[in-house]
Amino acid sequence: MTRLPAATLAQLEAAGVEAGRPLLISDADEVLFRFVETFVDHIEERGYSFDWSSFRLTGNVRRTSDGAVLDQPQVFALLQHFFAERAEDIPPVPGAAEALARLARAGVQIVVLTNIPVAQRDARRAALARNRMPYPVVVNTGDKGPAAAWLASRAGGPAVFIDDGPNNHASVKQAAPGIACLHFVATERLARLVEKPPEADGRPEDWPTLEREIAASLGLTCGGT
């Protein structure tokens, strides 16, 4: 297994995953929270626009005054500013909290694995709790495969991974092929810009369908209302 940074490993240990229970590892942005629409509103208020021409941020953010495309460091700076100001204010995806609550009652342990800046970890936890999703949060850096593999190894049973990013599905399948990967993008306009990655085991389009596929992958009888 790939060596994990000490800070990430400490968070994984603190997540409290128990052996012998089914595990759900969920991304936050575009799975639990409506990130892209909120980010676009944020940058438009500050003199930028979003092209919606591809499934990526870099290359799609332009300065409204002259149409200049922002490069990766500039987009990263906008993201840092966005999360510093709005991490607690991003609206939840409809149906996510209710579905997770039903899965938790059925015995599923849930961990939120997010690549939000480390400085906003507490804000993300607060936002999740306020929106009835009080689950452990692990702030990851880079590909999520090593962290997901660690969590699944600790659980020792069926595990499901949900993420909007194709690269993370590739990373997880490489690190832990036994994890069921479900590709989910909450914002329909963004979802149209990306195909299901070949490593993903499913591509549900809404939370009722996603809940049913999670339950089926974990061998449960609940799911999907």
What are these regions (language model features)?
Residues 62-95:
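Metal-dependent phosphoesterase signature
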Residues 117-160, 166-175:
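Substrate-recognition "cap/lid" segment bordering the active-site pocket of phosphatases
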Residues 1-72:
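Active-site neighborhood of HAD-like aspartate-dependent phosphohydrolases
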Residues 136-142, 199-209:
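Short acidic-hydrophobic, aromatic-tinged amphipathic segments that line or gate anion-handling sites
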